[in-house]
């Protein structure tokens, strides 16, 4: 019985010494926070290891984070992960929904961005940009023939209407000469004709009779205008003039109209385009409503994929510019020692307890061995 009690005592003493020793060693990692002095001499192991090496710990943590944890390669894999891209697209959709739900108008948005009187400024900006755009376009095309400037569809449409235009002109002319105004015009022309011939003209007028002669001329004009040959000649004339006009350089048209009038027309058209409708004062969700489905289904996912690719291509420069190692170091150095201790303990509390228990276990085993050796001797 005495032997058992002796061995048990040795095991208990060894376990106590081992456990307390490891516990003190763990505590000395953090405590004391400040160096301790006795008779002007600093006690060894003060301050604790972590307070003493906090700067080195902060620098090492920063390097570890950049070199092994938050690396450019890891960030690139995350950015190019389809699930992350899909999540980014969903973020974009959610943000856009919240933004549209505010019922903000373009005018309110521009004013919130610091742009006062947005309608007037947009009109002036649109007019200026339109004039500059026309000037650039004119510099490129003004010496080219009009046939090269006109869109092919417009040119085909105009050419297809030349034939019908000839018939239209003939019919309108025929309608005019059939009217009372046209008849009076014919009568006036005949009278001037006879008057210009002097006495001979007066004699002819007396013989023929003005009224009957007007009716005859009117009838002949009608036959002439209805004749297919007349319309064919008119069509050829229109084709000739059309092709001649197509060969003119654009500068000729500018000179005919006047550059100042063209500039004024362009600026006026740009202003009317901005003024057309009340879109500046309509909620953005109403303006975007017709395009909402393609915007949410295609444009936002494409934008998310594009942003991911751009960030992935520049990730090394971004990480270097951010200075993650410096951020981690500065953050760790800004922690109080008590908070730093709490952080480390929250991570490794279980392991530190196991180290204490392991010290007690080893101390108990050593005590048992010592007890056996003592009994043997």
From Swiss-Prot:
Cellular localisation: Cell membrane
Protein's membrane topology: Multi-pass membrane protein
The keyword Ubl conjugation is annotated on this UniProt entry: no
Family: Belongs to the UPF0754 family.
Transmembrane domains' residue ranges: 7-27, 357-377
Entry's Gene Ontology cellular component terms: plasma membrane
Chief place of localization: membrane
Keywords: Cell membrane, Membrane, Transmembrane, Transmembrane helix
UniProt protein name: UPF0754 membrane protein GK0639
Presence of keyword ATP-binding: no
Organism: Geobacillus kaustophilus (strain HTA426)
